[in-house]
Amino acid sequence: MKSPSPVDPESPSSPDCKGGSSSKRRRLPWRMTMSLAYQSLGVVYGDLSTSPLYVYKAAFAEDIQHSETNEEILGVLSFVFWTLTLVPLLKYVCVVLRADDNGEGGTFALYSLLCRHARAALLPPGGGGGGGEPGDEDQFLDAGADKKAAANGNALALSGRGGGGGAAAGVRRLLERHKVLQRVLLVLALVGTCMVIGDGVLTPAISVFSAVSGLELSMEKHQHKYVEVPIACFVLVCLFCLQHYGTHRVGFLFAPIVITWLLCISMIGVYNIVHWEPNVYRALSPYYMYKFLKKTQRGGWMSLGGILLCITGSEAMFADLGHFNQLSIQIAFTCMVYPSLILAYMGQAAYLCKHHIIESDYRIGFYVSVPEKIRWPVLAIAILAAVVGSQAVITGTFSMIKQCTALGCFPRVKIVHTSDKVHGQIYIPEINWILMILCLAITIGFRDTKHLGNASGLAVITVMLVTTCLMSLVIVLCWHKSIFLAFGFIIFFGTIEALYFSASLIKFREGAWVPIVLAFIFMAIMCIWHYGTIKKYEFDLQNKVSINWLLGLSPNLGIVRVRGIGLIHTELDSGIPAIFSHFVTNLPAFHQVLIFLCIKNVPIPHVSPEERFLVGRIGPKEYRIYRCIVRYGYHDVHKDDQEFEKELVCSVAEFIRSGAAAAADAAASSKPKNVCGGGAEESEKEEEERMSVIPSGSIRMMEEDGGAGAPSSEDTVGGSGSGSGRGSSRGGGGAREIMSPSPSPPPVVVAPRKRVRFVLPAASPRPDAGVREELQELMDAREAGMAFILGHSYVKAKSGSSFFRRLVINFCYDFLRRNSRGPNYAVTIPHASTLEVGMIYYV
């Protein structure tokens, strides 16, 4: 256990200077890497592998026509080849995958990585970021943490902020000093997140609709238009209705389905190349892109909105990085996905080079290039592959919503873990049904691949542009590379993506308005929730009660201490929340052991159990008042209430036993009390300095029913060693136990609800009398039960506020609060043990 020292509650571990975790960068065995590469084909590449279903159809929708010179089809193939080569292969596989945040990827991972290397966080403090206020202690790497890292010789902890040369230092200072730039950074991350959510609506629609559209070549045209949309909607409804069962039961089929699909389209491509046009490889020359744009001009530029669909799903390589590793994703793409897609697109182009006559029922698309004898089996495989690709996008949307909720940027929703083995497999009921309704509405409303492609393309390219912008900052701030390299990265890839973005945006009235509207709605929800949460925290910060107020409570004020443990939730990691003073003022009593619990969702993926709990003491030890800060990463799974209660009590017991409490008391007594106006602040500073990291598992707590009986007398040693005469310790073969006394025989009318004993580590020294007395009182309180005091705040705009603030706070934020779930820690708390304290916050 670490000794009491200035500990930053927002920085549980030292970030790697490159953003990756050492555990993730360890080289895995070759067999395991290949197994992960195989699995990634079904999870990561389902969406990307189904893009040949609709790319040519979207590119030749109306903007350009297929002529006998083949310049159009060869130009489109050239654009497809170089887009696949430059964006997924060069940008993502070679560069972006290296910018992981402790093994995790995605837009928020890049944002969290940047915030840890510069004081640029504007996330709600209870949800993973500093409030951004001057002097706020909730920063990722404060001066105290830097001193501690330097004292421990940990250069890596300082490398995130201290090194990097003039360019990194200059960019860091620019971000830290200008709130506008910090807001721009947060807005970029939120825009990318909103577009990912929009992609979760559009990708299932276009993938399933395009797969089902193969029926147009197998039936009459007047019959097809009445069959295509109902079948697509039926498949989509089944897909969303099965989400709550999870994917672990059928997940083993995902990789074989995608592999079968990739082999199928690549073999069809080879057949078409050999049979129709072996010289189609000429289109791999960039010269054909120039010829294409020169001939088609504005029509060719607008057709780029359909061509960019060839890279839809590329962002999943980075977003799903946490489930695999960098090498496995690179192997799967370069060895299987990339060559299969190139062969598929070349095969379609080879077929179209020899088929120029456009009949009344003829459309350029994937299925026209499939030999008629195998068209039905290919149709079945295509539908299965589209379902797999859609499933991956839906799961990714759930994961993104979970990250936003954990970081305080989205209203709380119900998160169901569908697998006991894989923590990333989650299901969010509210989001699932919203996605289904929107997906069905778009499918029924558009009924056309062209409009669906325009909508999906804009969402895809916007996310990629956001990644490019954030990645250029990572190159400077986190990798400490030259600023010219960062400029080169953003200019090269930004120019390519801006070209596609402009081609998509110009089709606003033809479907591209959908992702913009969806992003605006989700962006408004996120901004309103973020604004209301920040204002609520600022009210807590400004109205918190000094520790001296709590220490001044004396028996003559009528304060009563009752048996048990009182667990008071607060979003503050220092001081006393205003809601507790409100509670004590109206009900002058609190428990014999009081724990102020602060749950922090920090902007890193995972917090190790050894660094999860921070424990400190408030006031003299006779008060039995503690503060506990529990830190979770945005991918951590919250435990159930019973397990959490045990770990919480054990962390306090370990704090008492290990000597950290004695060291904290000595540190407190050695400092003179400040009785001037700044005494409260000084006391809070001293208290924060006494916070200690408590590793889990040092002390185990055993609980038995009250009637289980006392241990035998020969197992009990030193029964009165505690000074109070109530505790006993038992020596075993490998551990020492401190037990509560046996329940008394018949005069006792009400037996304790449970008997508690702490099992100490085998090598631990015998605790002294003061420690035993404090542990004994903690055991007595645990036996009496634990009560949860939860604040229920109503946020209202204060009088004199502007109309806009009253609209946002009194109506929009209040509506979101009333329709969101309660905090995660409160979901499984027994209602009989919960006391809610209501208070109105005027902000």
From Swiss-Prot:
Biological processes per GO annotation: potassium ion transport
Main location group:
membrane
For this UniProt record, the keywords arranged alphabetically read as follows: Ion transport, Membrane, Potassium, Potassium transport, Transmembrane, Transmembrane helix, Transport, Vacuole
Q: Which residue ranges run through the membrane?
A: 35-55, 73-93, 184-204, 226-246, 250-270, 299-319, 327-347, 378-398, 426-446, 452-472, 483-505, 511-531
Q: Which GO terms describe its cellular component?
A: membrane; vacuolar membrane
Q: Where is the composition biased (Low complexity)?
A: 1-15
> Its topology with respect to the membrane?
Multi-pass membrane protein
Q: Which residues does the entry place in the Vacuolar compartment? A: 56-72, 205-225, 271-298, 348-377, 447-451, 506-510
Q: Which residues lie on this side of the membrane: Cytoplasmic?
A: 1-34, 94-183, 247-249, 320-326, 399-425, 473-482, 532-843
| Tissues and organs where the protein is expressed, per its UniProt entry | Expressed in roots, shoots, and panicle at flowering stage.
Keyword Acetylation annotated: no
Q: For the region Disordered, what residue ranges are annotated?
A: 1-25, 667-747
Subcellular location, record wording: Vacuole membrane
Stretches with biased composition (Gly residues)? 718-735
Give the GO molecular function terms: potassium ion transmembrane transporter activity
Q: Which family does it belong to?
A: Belongs to the HAK/KUP transporter (TC 2.A.72.3) family.
What is the purpose of this protein? Answer: High-affinity potassium transporter.
Q: Please state what the protein is called.
A: Potassium transporter 10
